Amino acid sequence: MLYIVPTPVGNLEDITFRALRVLKEVDLILAEDTRTSSVLLKHYDIHTPLKSHHKFNEHETSDDMAERIAAGMTVALISDAGTPCISDPGFMLVRACVERGVEVQCLPGATAFVPALVNSGLPNDRFYFEGFLPQKKGRQTRMKILAEQTHTMIIYESPFRLVKTLEQLAEYMGADRRASVSREISKLHEDTQRGTLAELANHYKQTPPKGEIVLIVEGANS
């Protein structure tokens, strides 16, 4: 059995009783970064063996791990924060398990974009998840496509690229397109700023952002 286990995006209390039980009972935990995950596991007195599974090794390890799970091992997959496979490693392992007929269970739990979307004040009955934009090749093409998207858009971004992204989106979508920026979700300094793309770009030029960021942008003709 492979369990996909969401972990807190900020506050360590944002984890379910079921997730804690699974992490204690499985034979092995696969973690995106064992150092980061060790903090959570130590906090909850979980001593299950831990092994790295990240974007740099999942191409080589997913098939072997799926074979071990098929042979009877129970494994939990976690990421540094939030739900694995959502802009995080895990898809290749899930696919390898599915191809072998291995049962996969994804537990419900934390993910950063849901509170950011709800807090944005923008329409959320339909939305489009973009995740991380390309940093170089294909970036302008994605911007053009997003400019025509009619549903509210969800974009993950680095604090170091946020101003550039806001300025580029304003260029393709118009400076008056409404948006929100949520950062440090569920952490001590959680913050959401709302305004137009131009206003937000100007704000973060003057106040450089820190922490993990979710950008929500209203759809065309909203």
Residue positions per predicted region:
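Glycine-rich, flexible N-terminal cofactor/catalytic loop recognition
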Residues: 1-55
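Loop/turn-to-beta-strand initiation segments
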Residues: 1-2, 71-76, 152
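Short active-site oxyanion
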Residues: 23-29, 101-104, 152-153
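Conserved helicase motor
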Residues: 52-59, 132-134
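Glycine/small-residue-rich loop that forms an oxyanion/phosphate-binding "nest" at active or ligand-binding sites
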Residues: 54, 62-111
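Class I SAM-dependent methyltransferase SAM-binding "motif I" and its flanking Rossmann-like core
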Residues: 92-149
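A contiguous loop/helix-start segment that scaffolds small-molecule binding in enzyme catalytic cores
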Residues: 152, 156-222
